[in-house]
From Swiss-Prot:
The gene is gmk. InterPro entries: GK/Ca_channel_bsu, Guanylate_kin-like_dom, Guanylate_kinase, Guanylate_kinase_CS, P-loop_NTPase. It comes from Pectobacterium atrosepticum (strain SCRI 1043 / ATCC BAA-672) (Erwinia carotovora subsp. atroseptica). The keyword Transport does not apply. CDD domains: GMPK (cd00071). ATP binds at residues 11-18. This is Guanylate kinase. One of its GO terms (cellular component) is cytosol.
């Protein structure tokens, strides 16, 4: 069976990364594509389920996993740990399922160092003005917070050149099509097709 592909997807806040991934998953069967589920030490919130939203673990268990090098990447955010389990990812990839990992550029660097075969995608907004409009449209932040987010977004976008693919999310449907096209092209790579169609190729080349 051909291995699945790990896709690292990064973008500044407001570029539409999460929306694109969720829209993609709705069009792909579960046995083809899944989203990575992180481990965390934070408390479970109402409506969240273990193994669906996060893998909820105690701090001691998380630290043990760090010591045993079980994480592709991990970080501490506001006193809670978050991390991506390498064994969990590899187990899914071994079944031929593609895995999408929504992560920032710093986490992406950590993962590429440990899994260079992963494919990475960066998503850009069509303009700074549109990015600011989307952030304001959420109605959650003050002008001061939005200005800070915009400054952070510019810093994040300077890392686009570290990625394999670049998508500009101006028209959502077109950006989603671009994302699907990347997946389709990766699945047609010779290394995967040789395994997938091994029996056919053997018959075609038999004397």
């Amino acid at each position: 069976m051909a291995q699945g592909t790990l896709y690292i997807v990064s973008a500044p806040s407001g570029a539409g990364k999460s929306s694109l991934i969720q829209a993609l998953l709705k069009t792909q069967p579960l046995y083809d594509t899944q989203v990575s589920i992180s481990h965390t030490t934070r408390a479970k919130r109402p409506g969240e389920n273990h193994g669906e939203h996060y893998f909820f673990v105690e701090a001691d268990e998380f630290k043990r996993m760090i010591q045993d090098s079980e994480f592709l990447e991990h970080a501490e955010v506001f006193g809670n740990y978050y991390g991506t389990s390498r064994p969990a990812i590899e187990q899914v990839l071994a079944t031929g399922v593609d895995v999408f990992l929504d992560i920032d550029w710093q986490g992406a660097q950590q993962i590429r160092a440990k899994m260079p075969q992963a494919r990475s995608i960066f998503i850009l907004p069509p303009s700074k003005e549109e990015l600011a409009r989307r952030l304001r449209g959420r109605g959650q932040d003050s002008d001061e917070v939005i200005a800070r987010r915009m400054s952070q977004a510019v810093a994040e976008m300077t890392h686009y050149g570290e990625y394999d693919y670049l998508i500009v999310n101006d028209d959502f449907d077109l950006a989603l099509l671009d994302l699907k096209t990347i997946i389709r092209a990766e699945r047609l790579r010779l290394s995967r097709q040789k395994i997938r169609h091994d029996a056919l190729i053997t018959k075609l080349l038999a004397d």
